[in-house]
């Protein structure tokens, strides 16, 4: 706007100036003479120059004004061209529409002058009108200029006011902020004021309570003073009462001492009376025995007086012959015992040598190439093994000499020679057993009392049946204190079964209250004597004590293999027990035992009475029985072998043969029997192979219960599912409580002491069974040897052939009275037979388990919780069985390969792989049941029952995933369905939470 105004003003001024320039040269006077005209023209030139200067100055001033206006209003310069085209240029063209004429020289001055005059007049008339019009226009422009200047001044004032307004707004904002701060301080001060008012009110209440409490304290102090005064009086009374009671107590003490003295005297009298009664009863018993013996002696005298001399000689000869036969039998038995003793001592020394060598090799010895080691001796035996073992022990001892071995385990490997004193004791017992009852000088009554029993006692003492636990108390205590090495404990692991079949005796270590051993009166034997050299066979007793004292030696000796050895031993015991039970269930009712063995099934044991030399039975009264019960002794009659019916030898059936020739009989698995001079082979450790080589360090731990192999179940059916692991971890983060993993191993502990008690009870009170076992040993030797040959020569490539062979072997061995009691008297391959049975029963158990998991059907009629528990228990059973197998699989494979047993079923591609695949199907059924229950359960998504059910399903799936090593396609589909339900629930929960938060924000 201002630019237009300024430009119009400048244009108008310029137009006026140009007009003046055009008018002034055309104003000369009328034409006259040349002189006048020239003078006039000369007179006009100075004025014209002055006007030009004035016009230039005015134009410069106007230009300065225009520049000033343009500099002030430079903001609207962009619209200048539009304004020039629209408004100014037309006016400027109107002003300049007339042509400007300039005087030009001409020859015809007159004509030109006339024409100029005429034109001048016309122009003057036109210029006058135009001048008037321009004057009016100038006036209008001046008025317009004044108006625009006023507007410009007003604009400048408004612009100054705008800056003032901005400043005022800024100050207003500052003031509002200050007002807000003041309001906040006012509110805080008001809140503090309210708090102070509340505190003042509370302080007033507290002051009132304080005053009340002070008043109560004053009252209580007054009461305390009153009570103190009263208690002082009561204390004085109590002191007087106590002093009187003390006086009475002293008097009572004096009376008590007198009463005690009297009671002691009465007790002494009672003891004396009881002693006299006991002596009187003993005298009565002795009198009765003497009368009985006197009657028997008189009867013998009468019979002898009636007999002729020839009859007496014949009877004496008969007795001499009987005694000779008995003596010969005893000598043979003693020789057999001595030979057994020699072989046992030789075996013990050899095993101790091997033990020392093995300890040295395991600790710090590397066997050079081409040189024999003790481990080789334990595997490959020959008649020269004893000499080699002795040479190795001397070599190791020489290498360790001077090193100052302070190993604590060396105490276990020191060879103790238990032979010399035991041999002396045995020979002394065998030679002086009949006269040991007369070794002391008792009184007359005791001699008379023992006279009738000397013959029976001597027969009992000299009988080989007393050889079990025949050591003296000192010997037993020393054997209890000694700790044996691990190889000795392995040698005597079946020590409870290594007793001679004709022995029975007394066990002092066993508790009398066990159900296997009836609480019967003890048998009076040679062991009750006090002489130090008693007992024919102290080896059995020492071995029995050793078997009790070395239970934990393996743990102390080889701690590195302690856990694996325990697991192997427990599994072996468990499988043996199952095999015995299965064999008893299958063949127990078909075995025809001799009539005498029918007594074994009866719990009642009849103790026969004493038979005298003439065959008369002693009849004692109840009074004598009560007297004998205090002594806890009884006598046992001698049973004869001819009373047991011997069965004819059994002809074994041929073993089953596989169609593909899986069993071969020409393998070198059967070792030839060693000569009598060579040491017996050391037994393998129970449940496993030999210890690892010394150079290789401890064996690698069993592989963790890991993933199923790629080849298991055919192809890549099972693969890892990281989605399941992530989902399980996310759920477990939300779960605050963590459940403990169930234990994976349920190891059954074999009660060896119960078995030992049962065996001892058989030995002590059921000798008929032992005689029947001896009859089988004598008659079924060829039968057992043929079975042993078949077992040694057996080798299999198919596990089904092994099952058939084990079934045949159990059926054949069921013919024997007692398998182990008979087989221990022969060269029976116990290790291989046990391995065959162990593999067969383990395979059958795994197949039953796999069938149980595969055939499991989820009953829809069953409620949710029992159905899920049923599947969970089945999974726990599967895990326990598989993990227990995996922990001992390496040792079992090496052992089975040694005996020619197939091991492919133990790998992950065998039965174990099938079980893992079946567990994946079980997980699918579990997840489907959980999904079905989630759909059927009514309630909100935040219901804890739904969350717990979902978490339970994911936990089960994760557990099976880790156990089987992955999921198949169907199980993954079931898992995705379960996870989709969880995601929908979590999405709904998130939407609800967002809606709730939006509502809270809108309320706020």
UniProtKB/Swiss-Prot annotation:
Alphabetic keyword roster: Chloroplast, Coiled coil, Membrane, Phosphoprotein, Plastid, Plastid outer membrane, Repeat
Start and end residues of each stretch annotated as Leucine-zipper 1: 269-290
Disruption phenotype: Defective in chloroplast photorelocation movement, leading to damage of the photosynthetic apparatus and subsequent bleaching of leaf color and necrosis under high light conditions. Chloroplasts gathered at the bottom of cells, regardless of the light conditions.
Region (Leucine-zipper 2), start-end ranges: 802-823
Function: Required for the positioning and movement of chloroplasts. Interacts with profilin and actin independent of its polymerization status. Regulates chloroplast localization by anchoring chloroplasts to the plasma membrane and forming a bridge to the actin cytoskeleton.
The organism of origin for this protein: Arabidopsis thaliana (Mouse-ear cress)
Modified residues (Phosphoserine): 399
Known tissue expression: Expressed in cauline leaves, rosette leaves, stems and flowers, but not in roots.
Membrane topology label: Peripheral membrane protein
One BP term from GO: chloroplast relocation
Record note on what altering residue 20 to A does: No effect on targeting. Loss of targeting
Region feature Disordered, mapped onto this chain: 22-63, 398-482, 504-536, 612-718, 736-755, 979-1004
Keyword Kinase: no
Record localization: Plastid, Chloroplast outer membrane
Feature: compositional bias, Low complexity: 427-439
Protein name (Swiss-Prot/TrEMBL): Protein CHUP1, chloroplastic
Residue ranges, annotated region (Required for chloroplast localization): 1-25
Main location as per UniProt: plastid
Bias-annotated ranges (Pro residues): 670-706
Domain notes: The N-terminal region (1-25) is necessary and sufficient for targeting and anchoring the protein in the chloroplast envelope membrane.
Record GO cellular component, one term: cytosol
Gene name tied to this protein: CHUP1
Sections of the chain in a coiled coil: 123-341
Highest taxon above the source species: Eukaryota
Biased composition (Polar residues): 409-419, 504-517, 612-624, 744-755
């Amino acid at each position: 706007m201002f630019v237009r105004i300024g430009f119009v003003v400048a244009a108008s001024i310029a137009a006026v100036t140009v007009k003046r320039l055009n008018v002034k040269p055309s104003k000369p006077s009328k034409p006259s003479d040349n002189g006048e005209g020239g003078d006039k023209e000369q007179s006009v030139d100075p004025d014209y120059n002055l006007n030009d200067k004035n016009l230039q100055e005015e134009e410069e001033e106007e230009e300065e004004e225009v520049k000033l206006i343009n500099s002030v209003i430079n903001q609207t310069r962009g619209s200048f061209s539009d304004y020039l085209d629209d408004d100014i240029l037309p006016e400027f063209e109107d002003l300049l529409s007339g042509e400007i004429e300039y005087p030009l020289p001409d020859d015809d001055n007159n004509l030109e002058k006339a024409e100029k005059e005429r034109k001048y007049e016309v122009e003057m008339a036109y210029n006058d009108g135009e001048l008037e019009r321009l004057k009016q226009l100038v006036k209008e422009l001046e008025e317009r200029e004044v108006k625009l200047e006023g507007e410009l001044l007003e604009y400048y004032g408004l612009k100054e006011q705008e800056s003032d307004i901005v400043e005022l707004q800024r100050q207003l904002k500052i003031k509002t902020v200050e007002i807000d701060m003041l309001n906040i301080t006012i509110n805080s001060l008001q809140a503090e004021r309210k708090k102070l008012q509340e505190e003042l009110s509370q302080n007033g209440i507290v002051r009132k309570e304080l005053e009340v409490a002070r008043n109560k304290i004053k009252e209580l102090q007054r009461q305390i003073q009153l009570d103190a005064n009263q208690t002082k009086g009561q204390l004085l009374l109590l002191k007087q009462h106590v002093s009187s009671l003390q006086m009475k107590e002293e008097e009572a003490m004096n009376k008590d001492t007198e009463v005690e003295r009297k009671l002691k005297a009465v007790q002494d009298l009672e003891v004396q009376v009881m002693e006299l009664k006991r002596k009187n009863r003993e005298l009565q018993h002795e009198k009765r025995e003497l009368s009985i013996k006197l009657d028997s002696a008189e009867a013998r005298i009468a019979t002898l007086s009636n007999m002729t001399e020839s009859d007496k000689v014949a009877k004496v000869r008969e007795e001499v012959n009987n005694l000779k036969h008995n003596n010969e039998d005893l000598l043979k038995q003693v020789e057999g015992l001595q030979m057994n003793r020699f072989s046992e001592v030789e075996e013990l020394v050899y095993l101790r040598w091997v033990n020392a060598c093995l300890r040295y090799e395991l600790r710090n010895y590397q066997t050079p190439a081409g040189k024999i080691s003790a481990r080789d001796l334990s595997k490959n035996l020959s008649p020269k093994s004893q000499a080699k073992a002795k040479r190795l022990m001397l070599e190791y001892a020489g290498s360790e000499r001077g090193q100052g071995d302070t190993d604590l385990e060396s105490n276990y490997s020191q060879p103790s020679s238990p032979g010399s004193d035991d041999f002396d004791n045995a020979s002394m017992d065998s030679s002086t057993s009949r006269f040991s009852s007369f070794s002391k000088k008792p009184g007359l009554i005791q001699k008379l009392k023992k006279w009738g029993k000397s013959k029976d006692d001597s027969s009992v003492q000299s009988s080989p049946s007393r050889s079990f636990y025949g050591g003296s108390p000192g010997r037993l205590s020393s054997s209890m204190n000694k700790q044996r090495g691990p190889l000795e404990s392995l040698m005597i692991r079946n020590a409870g079964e290594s007793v001679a079949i004709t022995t029975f005796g007394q066990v002092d270590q066993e508790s009398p209250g066990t159900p296997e051993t009836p609480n019967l009166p003890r048998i009076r034997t040679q062991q009750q004597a006090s002489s130090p050299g008693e007992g024919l066979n102290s080896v059995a007793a020492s071995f029995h004590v050793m078997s009790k004292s070395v239970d934990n030696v393996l743990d102390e000796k080889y701690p590195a293999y302690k856990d694996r050895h325990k697991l192997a031993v427990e599994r072996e015991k468990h499988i043996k027990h199952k095999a015995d039970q299965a064999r008893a269930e299958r063949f127990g009712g078909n075995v025809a035992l001799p009539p005498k063995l029918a007594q074994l099934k009866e719990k009642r044991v009849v103790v026969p009475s004493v038979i005298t030399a003439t065959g008369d039975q002693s009849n004692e009264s109840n009074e004598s029985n009560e007297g004998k019960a205090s002594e806890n002794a009884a006598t046992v009659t001698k049973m004869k072998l001819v009373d047991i019916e011997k069965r004819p030898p059994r002809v074994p059936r041929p073993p089953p043969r596989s169609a593909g020739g899986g069993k071969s009989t020409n393998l070198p698995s059967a070792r030839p029997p060693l000569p009598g001079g060579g040491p017996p082979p050391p037994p393998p450790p129970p449940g496993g192979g030999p210890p690892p080589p010394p150079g290789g360090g401890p064996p690698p731990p069993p592989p963790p219960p890991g993933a199923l192999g790629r080849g298991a179940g055919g192809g890549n059916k099972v693969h890892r599912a990281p989605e399941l692991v992530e989902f399980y971890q996310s759920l477990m983060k939300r779960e605050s409580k963590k459940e403990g993993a169930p234990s994976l191993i349920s190891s059954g502990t074999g009660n060896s002491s119960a078995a030992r008690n049962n065996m001892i009870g058989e030995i002590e009170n059921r000798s008929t069974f032992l005689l029947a076992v001896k009859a089988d040993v004598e008659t079924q030797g060829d039968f057992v040897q043929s079975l042993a040959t078949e077992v040694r020569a057996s080798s299999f490539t198919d596990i089904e052939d092994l099952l058939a062979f084990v079934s045949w072997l159990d059926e054949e061995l069921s013919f024997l009275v007692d398998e182990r009691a008979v087989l221990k008297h022969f060269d029976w391959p116990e290790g291989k037979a046990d391995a065959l049975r162990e593999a067969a029963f383990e395979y059958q158990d795994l197949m039953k388990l796999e069938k149980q998991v595969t055939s499991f059907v989820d009953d829809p009629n069953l409620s949710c919780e029992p159905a899920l528990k049923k599947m969970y228990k089945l999974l726990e059973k599967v895990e326990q069985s598989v993990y227990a197998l995996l922990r001992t699989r390496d040792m079992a494979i090496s052992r089975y390969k040694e005996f020619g047993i197939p091991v492919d079923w133990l790998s992950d591609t065998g039965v174990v792989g099938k079980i893992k695949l079946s567990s994946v199907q079980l997980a699918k059924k579990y997840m489907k049941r959980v999904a079905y229950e989630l759909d059927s359960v009514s309630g909100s998504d935040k219901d804890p029952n739904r969350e717990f059910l979902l978490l339970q399903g994911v936990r089960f799936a994760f557990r099976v995933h880790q156990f089987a090593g992955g999921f198949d396609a169907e199980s993954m589909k079931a898992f995705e369905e379960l996870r989709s339900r969880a995601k929908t629930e979590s999405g709904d929960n998130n939407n609800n939470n967002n809606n709730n938060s939006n509502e809270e924000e809108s309320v706020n």
